Design a protein with these regions (language model features):
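Bacterial Sec-dependent N-terminal signal peptides
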Residues: 1-26
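GH16 jelly-roll
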Residues: 19-265
Length: 265
C-alpha cells in the first residue's frame, strides 16, 4: 500500500505553512481491507484483478468509442492506472475495466482516488453492476454509480442508483450531484458505503447523498446480491455527448491512484 507523505513547506519566519493534505478517509469503524489495487506494478492492468470489456456497440448509450485491451488505452505507470481515450483517424478508442469474477462483493465500503479528464464530450465513470442478473436484465438487478462526470460540466460530480422502480429510462432514478472544484485538475476521493439498509456516498470524506432501502421489494432494492466494479472512460453518448465533442480534443485521460474495498470484520 502506498505510503503517503504529508508535505509541509514552512516559511523561514515560521509564520506560514502550506500543506498538501490527502482528503480524510471515510472508512467506517469495524471495516477491514479485503481487496485493493494500488497500481504499483508498471505495465498492463493486473490480470488477477481486472478484465477488459471490449467492443464498439454504443454500450446502450450511443457512445462513440471502441473499447480495446491495448496498452495505448489502459496502462499502469508510476503508481497510477491511466485510462486513455484517443482519436485515431476520426475514430475514438478507449478502455473499460471490470472486476467481474475477480472481485465481487455484497455490501462493503468502496473507495477510489481518481482524477477525471477535462474536455467536452468525455464521460468517465466508476460504477457497479451485478455479477449475476438474479432479478433480470438491466435495470431489474440494479446499478450503483459511485461517480459519473460529463465534460461539459467540469466541476460537477454525479452519483445515482438504478433499479426496476427507479431508473433514468422512466425518469425516476435516484440521483444527486455535487460541486467539486478542480475535479479535472487534481485527485479526489470518491467512496460509497453499501449496507443492507442504505447506500451512502462520499466525496473527499464528506457524505453527500444517501439512498435508504424502502424494504418493499427487489424492484426498489435489488442490492442484496454480489456486484463488481467498473472503471471506464466513454466518449460522447446520450449524456456525455449532449453538448457535442470538442473538435480540438485528440486525447483524454482518467487517472486512478488506487481502488480499495473494505468489508465488516
Amino acid at each position: 500500500m502506498k505510503n503517503r507523505i504529508l508535505l509541509c513547506v514552512i516559511v523561514a519566519a515560521g509564520l506560514f505553512s502550506s500543506c498538501d493534505r490527502e482528503p480524510v478517509s471515510a472508512v467506517p469503524e469495524g471495516m477491514t481491507l479485503v481487496w485493493s489495487d494500488e497500481f504499483d506494478r508498471d505495465g498492463a492492468p493486473d490480470p488477477e484483478k481486472w478484465v477488459y470489456s471490449t467492443g464498439g456497440n454504443g454500450w446502450g448509450n450511443g457512445e462513440l468509442q471502441f473499447y480495446t485491451d491495448k496498452r495505448e488505452n489502459s496502462i499502469v505507470k508510476d503508481g497510477k492506472l491511466i485510462l486513455t481515450a484517443q482519436s485515431e483517424n476520426g475514430l475514438w478508442t478507449s478502455a473499460r475495466l471490470k472486476t467481474q469474477h475477480k472481485g465481487d462483493w455484497t455490501y462493503g465500503f468502496f473507495e477510489i482516488r481518481a482524477k477525471v479528464p477535462r474536455g467536452r464530450g468525455t464521460w468517465p465513470a466508476i460504477w457497479m453492476l451485478p455479477t449475476f442478473m438474479k432479478y433480470g436484465n438491466w435495470p431489474r438487478s440494479g446499478e450503483i454509480d459511485i461517480m459519473e462526470h460529463v465534460g461539459f460540466e467540469p466541476d460537477i460530480i454525479h452519483t445515482s442508483v438504478h433499479t426496476n422502480a427507479y431508473n433514468h429510462k422512466i425518469g425516476t432514478h435516484k440521483t444527486a450531484h455535487d460541486t467539486v472544484r478542480g475535479a479535472t485538475k487534481k485527485f479526489q476521493t470518491y467512496a460509497m458505503e453499501w449496507d443492507p439498509d442504505y447506500i451512502q456516498w462520499y466525496i473527499n470524506g464528506e457524505p453527500f447523498y444517501r439512498f435508504d432501502n424502502p424494504h418493499i421489494s427487489n424492484a426498489e432494492w435489488p442490492f442484496d446480491i454480489p456486484f463488481y466494479l467498473i472503471l471506464n472512460l466513454a466518449i460522447g453518448g446520450t449524456w456525455g455527448g449532449q453538448q457535442g465533442i470538442d473538435e480540438k480534443m485528440e486525447k483524454a485521460e482518467m487517472i486512478v491512484d488506487y481502488v480499495r474495498v473494505y468489508q465488516k470484520n
